[in-house]
Amino acid sequence: MTKMLRSQIVLAAAVSLAGAMCFAQDGAATYKAKCAMCHGPTGTPSAGMAKAMGIKPVSDPSIKALTVAQIEATVKSGKGKMKPIAGLTDAQVTAVAEYFKTLK
């Protein structure tokens, strides 16, 4: 019985990890398609874009402090010069917000 329970726990963990990895990949693809043109492929905007639009890099303490929920709200509603990103499902918004938090 213990061996069977252990096997079920390992299987559940593997399925959860695979789901999280797919979610991160979806977030990366959405970021590349919808965000990277302004925020840069690694979260560091070009000098011109940073100056023109006031975009801070992900390494900025104020950006690092953002929660996933705050990033989701910005993606959905926009903030400052950033317009809302239209056409994304709630799952895509969450995925891109979680991906954004992984950028250094």
Positions of predicted regions on the chain:
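Extracytoplasmic/secreted proteins, especially bacterial periplasmic and envelope-associated proteins
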Residues: 26, 30, 66, 70, ...
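Electron-transfer interface patches adjacent to heme c in soluble/periplasmic c-type cytochromes
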Residues: 56-69, 84-91
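C-terminal capping alpha-helices of c-type cytochrome domains
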Residues: 74-75, 86-104
